[in-house]
Amino acid sequence: MQGVYPAIITPFKDGKVDYDGLQSNLDFLIENGVSGVIPVGTTGESPTLTPLEHEQVIEKVVEFVDGRVEVIAGTGSNSTSEALEFSQYAEDVGVDGVLLITPYYNKPSQEGLKRHFGEIANSINVPIVLYNVPSRTALNIEPYTIKYLFEEYSNITAIKEANPNLSQVSEVLDSCNIDVLSGNDELTLPIISLGGKGVVSVVANIAPKEFVQMVDFANAGKFDKAKEIHYKLFPLMKLMFIETNPIPIKTAMNMLGMPSGELRLPLCEMAESNKSKLQNALNNLGLLK
């Protein structure tokens, strides 16, 4: 995996998934050069989708994308059997890979993680992208566990690394050849400089062209040009997490007239003071017309 993979939002309208809006957003991203899309992850509000909605969104994304870019579907869970069912379904409807978050809340041991991911890897054929995000799961996939999984299972090929500890990233890249994608927009360039391949991005939902240019420059070793784009987008990167993701990105998309719609409880609308900051950043970037 290499390039920019937006973690896409799930647009809602009147309490239901807005599939017309979803198709419009996908076309916009693909037209602006992204390498792939990642539906039904954290940014896609997967915790508040019903199991049927989760599967339907995956199927519709595969249909709408129609082979133009990769579709890496979020199929993780803190239940191995549920993650396995979602992953098998995603494979059956034609995804190019699955994204598996570290089990959250029940906090398995590293041995439990090996068995969890191994059980799924043995049951599907499509590539698996591990997703390490300790800030949400209260659990880190240790570098030795990542190395073990990469070497033991041929279809575990990449990791979305959202642990901001660059020592961990260095240790992983030094120990094995797994593809590392940044799980934090603002750490994209540091991770690529260490040997990473790209980013699973939130900001790319609204600035895909700029993110693709930045990552392409970085992967070509043109870090001076990449840094110019990084610092241009940096204020927006920070604001995307001024409140819980995906509240800021969905708010920004609504401001820009893009299909986004409401959030599902327990997530709710952004505080007015933060909306003003976000609007100013969008204005400064020339995104608001």
Curated annotation (Swiss-Prot):
GO terms for biological process: diaminopimelate biosynthetic process; lysine biosynthetic process via diaminopimelate. Pyruvate binds at residues 43, 200. Pathway: Amino-acid biosynthesis; L-lysine biosynthesis via DAP pathway; (S)-tetrahydrodipicolinate from L-aspartate: step 3/4. The record marks 42, 105 as: Part of a proton relay during catalysis. It comes from the Archaea. The active site is at residues 131, 160. Catalyzes the condensation of (S)-aspartate-beta-semialdehyde [(S)-ASA] and pyruvate to 4-hydroxy-tetrahydrodipicolinate (HTPA). This is 4-hydroxy-tetrahydrodipicolinate synthase. It comes from Methanococcus maripaludis (strain C7 / ATCC BAA-1331). The lineage of its organism: Archaea, Methanobacteriati, Methanobacteriota, Methanomada group, Methanococci.
